[in-house]
């Protein structure tokens, strides 16, 4: 999982693109360069000469600070270069700096995570489509996908999903034809198929698997959790022999989703924060699969506590304080001896 490359795009507002670029340049100790163009872009180089960018996105609803009126300059999208796992900490620090500088998000903002698709093939891509489809309902609930943003991150296309699993493509060309439902649209940047939670248009046009289902946040821990989740899902698709697209049904969503996260490899202290963020919006009992078992355990613990309390009370009743021992008892005790 940790060997996969990735990139991230985080939409925000509250500050201008120029301000955001200066903040990032300040973090790296370099200079921001205005590029302009269609996306009114700024470029910032790091110590490895990688390019981090700030660009405009028309879907962002601009908001400004207290004393200024919002305009299109407040549409800010942060775009990372190709990153490795250790870069997550750098991304977190940049996010903290932007937030401290006045950046904020609203319900028009989203986060897109791209995972390198070069290690995938037609089989593993079918796996990842099915893995996502099976857990889609739980993912949308735990991530609280904003209803207003759902047109930009639609659930799996049932036509594509059914065809993918009935015909089982043997090569990437067949998969591409199924994705576009005919003629390829890989050269169309804004092809309509891109607006899905799992976007394979990005595979054919950019060489990345794009996850689009995250509401934007400037909480560094949440951003880290989203990246780790995407890397874990991609890794599971790579190592799993096959995957079913049958939707997961559960009467205890929190337990079911936690079990899945552990199966993905998000286990141990390293991923404790990720599990916390990814489970906090789900209902259920994290420790017991069956809610009835949880209730039964509560009753057992309550009965045990009651029994212990009663035993403690009985012990106290049978204990005679030292100052209440009679004189005869004291004499008897002092006369007792052992001869050798």
Residue ranges and their predicted role:
Residues 1-104, 118-340:
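C-terminal accessory/tail domains of diverse enzymes
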């Amino acid at each position: 999982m940790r060997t996969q490359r990735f990139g991230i795009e985080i939409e925000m507002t509250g500050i201008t693109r120029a301000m955001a670029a200066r903040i990032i340049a300040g973090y790296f100790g370099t200079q921001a360069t205005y590029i302009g163009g269609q996306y009114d872009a700024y470029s910032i180089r790091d110590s490895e000469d990688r390019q981090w960018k700030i660009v405009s996105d028309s879907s962002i609803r601009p908001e400004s600070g207290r004393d200024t009126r919002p305009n299109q300059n407040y549409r800010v999208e942060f775009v990372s270069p190709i990153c490795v796992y250790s870069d997550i900490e750098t991304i977190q620090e940049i996010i903290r700096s932007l937030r401290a500088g006045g950046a904020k998000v609203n319900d028009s903002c989203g986060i897109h995570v791209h995972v390198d698709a070069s290690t995938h093939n037609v089989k593993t891509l079918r796996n990842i489509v099915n893995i996502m489809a099976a857990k889609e309902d739980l993912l949308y609930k735990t991530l609280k996908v904003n209803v207003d943003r759902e047109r930009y991150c639609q659930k799996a296309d049932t036509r594509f999903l059914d065809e993918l699993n009935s015909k089982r493509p043997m090569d990437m060309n067949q998969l591409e034809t199924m994705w576009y439902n005919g003629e390829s649209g890989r050269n169309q940047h804004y092809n309509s198929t891109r607006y899905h939670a799992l976007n394979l248009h990005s595979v054919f046009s950019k060489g990345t698997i794009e996850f689009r289902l995250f509401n934007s946040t400037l909480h560094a821990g949440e951003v880290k959790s989203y990246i780790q989740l995407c890397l874990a899902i991609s890794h599971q698709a790579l190592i799993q022999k096959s995957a079913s697209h049958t939707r997961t049904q559960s009467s205890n969503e929190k337990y079911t989703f936690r079990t899945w996260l552990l199966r993905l490899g998000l286990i141990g202290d390293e991923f404790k924060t990720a599990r916390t963020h990814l489970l906090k919006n789900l209902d259920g009992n994290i420790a017991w699969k069956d809610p009835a078992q949880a209730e039964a355990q509560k009753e057992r613990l309550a009965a045990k506590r009651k029994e212990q309390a009663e035993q403690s009370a009985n012990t106290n009743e049978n204990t005679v304080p030292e100052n209440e021992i009679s004189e005869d008892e004291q004499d008897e005790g002092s006369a007792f001896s052992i001869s050798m």
